[in-house]
Amino acid sequence: MSEPVTTPIFDGLAVGLCTYKRRDSLVRCLDHIAIAARALPAPPSVIVVDNDGEDASVGAAVQAFSERSGLPVHYRIEKTPGISAARNAVFDTAGQIGVRFVAMIDDDEWPSPDWLRELLKAQSDHAAVVVGAPVRPVFPDNAAKLKKYARYWSVDKQFLNGKPFVFCTCNFLIDMQALRDEPRPLFDEEFGLSGGGDTVFFRKLFFRGHDMAWSDAAWINEEVPPSRASFKWMRQRRFRVGNHAVRWESLDGGAPKSIAKSVGLSLRLAIYPLFRREPESVLVGWLLEYDKVRGRWASHFGDVFVEYARPAKPGEKVCR
């Protein structure tokens, strides 16, 4: 493992995002970042890490964005497959250009006009190292019925040990000063293809005492493509949540503690509908909880859900 970065951190903000074969949605995201940047006293830098690099039109689109927006853009190709390598490349670049804060967003999302200003405001108000914010799903027209269940596709405020806990990189701001003594790479390569490495990263920061905060005003939108606009996909996602949870729980407290939790959650399934935690539909809530528990047991028996596997054929999508 490499030594901690000791380069001084200076003032400034960079917006980072990783992309993989999503040129059109990447351009949409970048254009909305430019709108959000107008609310700031100084322009942010933009860091785009392409985890593919085979399509020259992506780099050309990023360059065109920089020219029309006037924002400084750092475009980097990361050939190592997996989301961990791409995220690490974002933070390596941020360290090289010397910014104080990094905000991250996914390439299939687009921010609200006040996104960056509200993230920075929450950081200042709470003196937080990490600030998270909501992600709101945007369904295709033929899946309007799913709006009733939108929260299953959303990212909302979470707590850990009674404190705000940011658990994913799809919408957050971080103070780079808190990372000066963190060993590199920040995101564990063991989670590069499976996903879940962002939760591992944030749990490390949380248990080392770094304060986290939440800003409801810094919301962003996420496109839900037809391939994700179904309960079949959501059940798979809940399986993945349970599967990955066992992996990071085992890192924290060891396998026996994680197995004990799985036993407890399995027994709770018999009375889970009584809790009515999902008022939209008791049955849907139970099925999703069942899939989460099923994913946990699969992990205990060595089955790792791989979210970022590369396509076997050109044009094929794998869990995206």
Question: Where do the protein language model's features map onto the residues?
Answer:
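Active-site nucleotide-sugar/metal-binding loop of Leloir-type enzymes
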Residues: 85-101
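N-proximal low-complexity "stem/linker" segments adjacent to membrane-targeting elements
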Residues: 1-35, 41
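Acidic donor-binding segment of Leloir-type glycosyltransferases
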Residues: 32-76
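Acidic donor-binding loop at a coil-to-helix junction in glycosyltransferase catalytic cores
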Residues: 192-203
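Short, flexible, basic/aromatic active-site loop/helix in glycosyltransferases
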Residues: 133-134, 147-165
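Short beta-strand-to-loop acidic/aromatic patch adjacent to the donor-nucleotide binding site
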Residues: 98-110
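Non-catalytic, C-terminal membrane-associated alpha-helical segments of glycosyltransferases
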Residues: 236-241, 253-320
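Conserved donor NDP-sugar-binding/catalytic core segment of glycosyltransferases
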Residues: 114-145
